[in-house]
């Protein structure tokens, strides 16, 4: 991929709005079933403010807010992605653009991070998680939503996805233990894993 897109896939999308819009639309379509499973499996009602970090067009955050009438949300993504989502802004949903490697993230009671960390290598993933940890109040929860590689050595879709993420972005799908190690390096502790029937919610807290 480096030979095809030397500057990296995400900077390339930032310069190609039509392709970026197509990609974001595809992500919304792909995640439809996953989002429904997440909102059915997890109780978001304890949270007042919910941040969606790298949340694209906000499909997950919108569904969570619909299921949690008392909550407000902050959608954080790159400027060109947030520009596509301008119509989502409301009294309950705030838009914030930036770079999670450089810019301050919002202070929230819970942080949704859905299929973001698998885009990055371990060092980059820890940097993203540390940025969240820096912004997170002591009582906050991190809700990382990813396809886990199971301990079973047999065939599994996540292993195919692992190869795809490595070839496209230098990223990785990971096991529960590997995510726990990333959390520890970033100042979080894994509390539990909620299986939604496919994708998993890894709940972590600041330490």
What positions do the PLM features span?
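Alpha-helical subdomain
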Residues: 39-40, 44-207
């Amino acid at each position: 991929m480096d030979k095809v897109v030397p500057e990296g896939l995400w900077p390339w999308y930032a310069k190609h709005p039509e392709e970026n819009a197509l990609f974001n639309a595809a992500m919304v379509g792909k995640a439809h079933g996953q989002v429904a499973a997440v909102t059915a499996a997890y109780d978001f009602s304890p949270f007042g403010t919910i941040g969606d970090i790298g949340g694209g067009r906000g499909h997950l955050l919108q569904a969570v807010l619909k299921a949690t009438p008392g909550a407000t949300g902050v959608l954080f993504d790159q400027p060109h992605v947030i520009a596509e989502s301008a119509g989502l802004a409301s009294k309950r949903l705030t838009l914030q653009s930036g770079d999670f490697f450089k810019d301050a993230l919002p202070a929230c009671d819970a942080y949704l991070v859905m299929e973001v960390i698998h885009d990055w290598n371990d060092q980059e993933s820890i940097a993203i998680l540390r940025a969240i940890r820096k912004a997170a109040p002591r009582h906050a929860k991190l809700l990382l939503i990813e396809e886990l590689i199971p301990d079973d050595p047999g065939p599994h879709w996540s292993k195919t996805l692992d190869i795809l993420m490595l070839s496209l972005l230098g990223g990785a799908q990971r096991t529960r233990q590997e995510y726990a190690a990333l959390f520890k390096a970033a100042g979080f502790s894994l509390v539990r894993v909620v299986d939604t029937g496919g994708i998993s919610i890894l709940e972590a807290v600041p330490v």
